[in-house]
């Protein structure tokens, strides 16, 4: 997994990946496709749920351990106890089971950037039909206007920040 990248770097990777793919398509006589991009928060949430309705975690249940007592994702089980789940840092993507869409580590391991702008009021005033708030901050904007949504939690976050929905 990739860690330590800014939102700008993640977005730049999407642009680079689009250019590489379009070059390959052009060389093979294929048509261009949609650009690669960071997901909207609502898109990330649906992808993380794996098509399960209102599922708290990608694996479908409210628990962070399976029946054998093993953790179902790589996140900090409790305060200051990083080692308890066997993942003292990031782990290989295939270390845990995929969700219903076949996506791995949608909770824990590394957090994911979304293209949605972060604003504390968006959850109070947002609408179910279009809950994503997009704002392209300008260089001179206040830092508060430059915040972006991060979802999924990471290996160093407790399980409650790894929920698939808010």
Regions inferred by a protein language model and the residue ranges of each:
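Conserved small/polar residues in nucleotide/adenosyl-binding loops
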Residues: 164-165
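Functional-site microenvironments in short loops/helix caps that host divalent-cation chemistry
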Residues: 1-161
């Amino acid at each position: 997994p990739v860690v330590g990248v800014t939102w700008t770097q993640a977005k730049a990777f999407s642009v680079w990946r689009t250019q590489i793919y379009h070059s390959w398509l052009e060389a093979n006589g294929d048509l261009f496709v949609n650009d690669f991009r960071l997901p909207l928060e609502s898109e990330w949430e649906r992808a993380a749920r794996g098509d399960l309705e209102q599922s708290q975690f990608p694996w479908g249940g409210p628990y962070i351990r399976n029946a054998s007592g093993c953790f179902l994702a790589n996140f900090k089980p409790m305060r200051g106890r990083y080692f308890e789940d066997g993942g003292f840092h990031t782990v290989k993507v295939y270390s845990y089971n995929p969700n219903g869409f076949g996506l791995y580590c949608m909770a824990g391991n590394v957090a994911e950037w979304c293209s949605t702008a972060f604003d504390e009021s968006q959850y109070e005033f947002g609408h179910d039909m279009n809950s994503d708030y997009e704002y392209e901050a300008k260089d001179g904007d206040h830092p508060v206007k430059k915040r972006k949504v991060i979802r999924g939690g990471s290996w160093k976050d407790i399980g409650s920040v790894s929920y698939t929905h808010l």
